[in-house]
Amino acid sequence: MPDALPPCSILILAGGRGQRMGGRDKGLVDWQGEPLIAHVHRAVRPLSDDLVISCNRNQAAYQAYADRLVGDAEADFPGPLAGVIAGLRVARHAWVVVLACDAPLVDRELIEGLLRLAVAGNSAAMVRQGGFWQPMFSVLPKRVLPVLEQAWAAGERSLQKALLREAVQGLECAESDRRLSNFNSPERLQD
């Protein structure tokens, strides 16, 4: 396989309720003096000319970190699957990196590893950590959009279950891999 990676879109999911954060918008919560979204943005910006953020509130604050914003088609924070569907609909490239807004330690090496794996297998790639899938660290071919839309129409709301309807390559990561840390509670922000 050639070293050159194909162009990809980046989709950052920031559309949740933030229940474990007391209802605060996780992407805009400060960590080390900056919003969590700023840390993720810094890691991914050099990798794509198409950075999409899925958010359902605070659009003005997120606009500074994205080329485009999308919201869920349904109200009331329907979950990450809805955000992925919305993002895939507008993505400009055939490959889409999916990340959460509350993973400030993600790095280029992890993203490029996922992208290489996806391209080599011509299928989705997702992190596996400690035997568990981590769908918020994945690369999807845009062509899975109809599969995800069908899953949604059939009542599926789990991003992981919807993605596993198709072939998925697993990128094994250690349980202690800090790059996969989700800062989704006030306690985690103390790390």
UniProtKB/Swiss-Prot annotation:
State the gene name recorded for this protein: mobA
Listed under GO biological process in this entry are: bis(molybdopterin guanine dinucleotide)molybdenum biosynthetic process
| GO cellular component terms given for this protein | cytoplasm
| Physiological role | Transfers a GMP moiety from GTP to Mo-molybdopterin (Mo-MPT) cofactor (Moco or molybdenum cofactor) to form Mo-molybdopterin guanine dinucleotide (Mo-MGD) cofactor.
**UniProt name for this protein:** Molybdenum cofactor guanylyltransferase
Top-level class of the enzyme under EC nomenclature: transferase
Database matches in NCBIfam families = molyb_mobA
Predominant cellular place of this UniProt entry's protein: cytoplasm
The EC code for this enzyme is: 2.7.7.77
Q: Which organism is it from?
A: Pseudomonas putida (strain ATCC 47054 / DSM 6125 / CFBP 8728 / NCIMB 11950 / KT2440)
Residues involved in Mg(2+) binding? 102
Q: Which family does it belong to?
A: Belongs to the MobA family.
- Range of residues in the leader sequence: none
Q: Can you state which reaction this protein catalyses?
A: Mo-molybdopterin + GTP + H(+) = Mo-molybdopterin guanine dinucleotide + diphosphate
DNA-binding keyword on record: no
Task: Describe the protein's quaternary organization and the partners it interacts with.
Answer: Monomer.
Q: Could you tell me where this protein is found in the cell?
A: Cytoplasm
Specify one Pfam family: NTP_transf_3
Asked whether the keyword Transferase is assigned, the reply is yes
Copy the domain comment: The N-terminal domain determines nucleotide recognition and specific binding, while the C-terminal domain determines the specific binding to the target protein.
Give one GO term, molecular function aspect.
molybdenum cofactor guanylyltransferase activity
Q: Which cofactor does it need?
A: Mg(2+)
Chain sites annotated for binding GTP: 13-15, 26, 72, 102
